[in-house]
Design a protein with these regions (language model features):
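A hydrophobic, helix-centered structural microdomain
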Residues: 23-96, 216-230
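N-terminal hydrophobic signal-anchor/signal peptide
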Residues: 1-47, 110-113, 171, 204-208, ...
């Protein structure tokens, strides 16, 4: 449904990158990628109906001018840009309203400059708050996994301008595929400050293993349920 996507850039862009971290391969086979494909194919029949229902709810609540999906350019492995997919949680043209919010609210501006996000973002819709709290807005990223842009486990995907804040830590980020879940998501998420999150991404890239990925995947549902209040 191409016309239903709100997109902010072209996925054909690239950035210069040098990833000095080894890949997880055994006998020429990318085991992590093979596992991602297998898990995505198993989950897709379960996830797709949920995505369709949520997409319909977003379209109904937004009216004819709203879009159900949102895509934004993120930096992938080796610096390749890709369109990261989400269910839309903000009002239409939300980015156009951000400068006014930051200009009139010094506290919000300070929070944005520190964390590159707002904990209580006024642009998020009522339904969007529920989707974010439960992380259901990220379900469409299963298609990013199938396309090879993302993995189930890895660093949080970030835009190009935000990656510049990583300094030399960006090479750790660029050595792996971004993930739907990861060390940051299961270690406090909103309670973890920005620099600590970057440190987690570096540590994951250096010590990544199949066993660790399985551990993060196993912890993710429990963390989501606890954060959602169930």
């Amino acid at each position: 449904m191409p016309s239903d996507f709100a997109s902010q850039s072209n996925s054909s862009q690239r950035v210069i990158a040098s990833a000095a971290y080894p890949e997880n391969r055994r006998g020429g086979v990318d085991l992590k990628r093979a596992f991602d494909l297998l898990l995505a194919m198993l989950l897709l029949p379960l996830v797709l109906p949920i995505i369709i229902v949520l997409w319909a709810m977003i379209r109904v609540s937004a009216g004819r001018h709203g879009t159900g999906f949102f895509s934004h350019a993120r930096v992938g492995r080796r610096g390749v840009m890709f369109d990261c997919l989400k269910l839309r949680t903000m009002v239409p043209e939300a980015d156009l309203g951000l400068p006014a919010i930051l200009a009139h609210d010094p506290a919000a501006r300070a929070e944005w400059e520190r964390d590159v996000k707002l904990r209580n973002d006024p642009r998020v819709t009522r339904l969007g708050r529920v989707l974010r709290k439960t992380s259901l807005d990220e379900l469409p990223q299963i298609f990013n996994v199938l396309a090879g842009d993302m993995s189930f486990v890895g660093p949080r995907p970030v835009p190009k301008d935000e990656l510049e804040r990583y300094g030399r830590a960006k090479y750790a980020y660029l050595s792996v595929r971004p993930g739907i879940t990861g060390a940051w998501q299961v270690s406090g998420r909103n309670d973890v400050d920005y620099n600590a999150r970057i440190a987690m991404d570096v540590e994951y890239a250096r010590r990544r293993s199949f066993a660790r990925d399985l551990g993060i995947l196993a912890r993710t549902p429990r963390v989501l349920l606890r954060r959602s209040g169930f």
